Amino acid sequence: MSKFYIENINLLNSEKKNNILSELNLLLSNYSAEERISWALSHLPHTQIMSSSFGIQSTVLLHLIIKKKPDIPVVLIDTGYLFPETYNFIDFLTNKFHLNLKVFRSTISSAWQEARYGKLWEKGIEGIDFYNNINKVQPMNFALNELSVQTWFAGLRRDQSKSRNLLPYLSIKKGIFKILPILDWSKDKIKDYLKENNLDTHPLYNNGYSSVGDTHTTKKHMPGMLEEETRFFGLKRECGLHEN
């Protein structure tokens, strides 16, 4: 399927668009992560970014993509509440890989938010959703518009949570192609790739964290816990960036 034809999927009605996406996802399911990235770089619209939380295993997708497109913009949404170790990790990887880092934040500072709304993360699911919208969803939407993004690479995996079990490799959200190259990777495959390529993991990994977000809504992984229970007090897994 030609790049020209794929770019024009958005002009089709929903039924035709979904049929083509189903065919493309079947194709991508037979590819390796490296092949998916190469295919996307060649066939999808060329105003491309990747997003990264610079979390526990974020180095994997960063390494896979920058090998093929070193100057790709790497979008980070900074809530102002990341762990100090995360900020240090961002600086370290940016310098090591010469990343084209693009940082976006809420238009309201964290201090001003607390003065205006209090500690939203302590106000149940509604407070968390409002917090995520201000600090993650709105800045990401601004980034997508500011950078005129047509194709978005992200590192979601099906084994991370129940909410990600049925995700496709390729989707279209608000006219933007979204590609998930390591969607089918297991934790073991992630660990093997990190080891084989001598890549760094987040400093908090060795302190018992399996997933890292904001300081106030991230817990250490305790025996018997699911990874998704370490975030947002177990009330939810997604922050809104990757929801419909």
Swiss-Prot record:
Cellular compartments annotated: Cytoplasm
Pathway noted in the entry: Sulfur metabolism; hydrogen sulfide biosynthesis; sulfite from sulfate: step 3/3
Q: Where is the active site?
A: 239 (nucleophile)
Q: Which reaction does it catalyse?
A: [thioredoxin]-disulfide + sulfite + adenosine 3',5'-bisphosphate + 2 H(+) = [thioredoxin]-dithiol + 3'-phosphoadenylyl sulfate
Q: Name one Pfam family in it.
A: PAPS_reduct
Listed under GO cellular component are:
cytoplasm
**Per its record, how is this protein called by name?**
Phosphoadenosine 5'-phosphosulfate reductase
Top-level lineage group: Bacteria
Q: Which family does it belong to?
A: Belongs to the PAPS reductase family. CysH subfamily.
- One record GO biological process: hydrogen sulfide biosynthetic process
Q: Name one GO molecular function term.
A: phosphoadenylyl-sulfate reductase (thioredoxin) activity
Residues in the signal sequence: none
Q: What does this protein do?
A: Catalyzes the formation of sulfite from phosphoadenosine 5'-phosphosulfate (PAPS) using thioredoxin as an electron donor.
Top enzyme category = oxidoreductase
- What Enzyme Commission number(s) does the record list for this chain? 1.8.4.8
Where it mainly occurs, coarsely classed, is cytoplasm
* Database matches in NCBIfam families: cysH, PAPS_reductase, PRK02090.1
Would the keyword Ribosomal protein be found if you checked this record's keyword annotation? no
The UniProt keywords, alphabetically, are:
Cytoplasm, Oxidoreductase
Gene3D superfamilies reported in the protein's UniProt record: HUPs (3.40.50.620)
Q: Which InterPro entries match?
A: PAPS/APS_Rdtase, PAPS_reduct_dom, PAPS_reductase_CysH, Rossmann-like_a/b/a_fold
At the highest ranks, the source species' classification is: Bacteria, Pseudomonadati, Pseudomonadota, Gammaproteobacteria, Enterobacterales
